[in-house]
């Protein structure tokens, strides 16, 4: 069995963003030479997420609206976490809802997606470098 590991780095200038990282994960798969196995893609920060969904602008805005309704950024004083001097209590909750990682089957050298599925990096507290781990195992 072969194993491949790579870190993808992001530095989102704004507070939040959804970035389609499917092409970068596909490039990792090509580099790995693995034809059949599993790809784990996970955010290595507690205010960022990796998830699978459709790459449709309206859906991204729906996520933004829904997450802000669930855990609004302001008032910052609303979050106990922010009493430590932070201002990102909402980002931790948003990440928890959106998830940490995805696992995608690899079949015949391709990510084995359903219709419309794409891999996204979700940033909820931007402004600094963060990384996503891609770990691929298989034959």
List where the protein language model places each region.
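Active-site histidine-anchored catalytic micro-motif
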Residues: 1-139
């Amino acid at each position: 069995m072969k194993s491949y590991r790579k870190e993808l780095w992001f530095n989102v200038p704004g507070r939040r963003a959804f970035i389609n990282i499917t092409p970068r994960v596909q490039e990792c798969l090509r580099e790995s030479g693995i034809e059949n196995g599993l790809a784990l893609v996970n955010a290595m920060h507690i205010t960022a997420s990796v998830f699978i969904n459709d790459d449709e602008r309206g859906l991204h805005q729906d996520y933004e609206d829904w997450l802000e309704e669930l855990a609004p950024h302001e008032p910052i004083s609303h979050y106990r976490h922010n009493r430590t001097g932070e201002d990102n209590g909402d980002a931790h909750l948003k990440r928890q809802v959106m998830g940490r990682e995805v696992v995608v089957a690899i079949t015949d050298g391709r990510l084995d997606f359903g219709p419309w599925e794409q891999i996204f990096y979700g940033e909820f507290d931007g402004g600094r470098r963060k990384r996503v781990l891609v770990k691929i195992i298989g034959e």
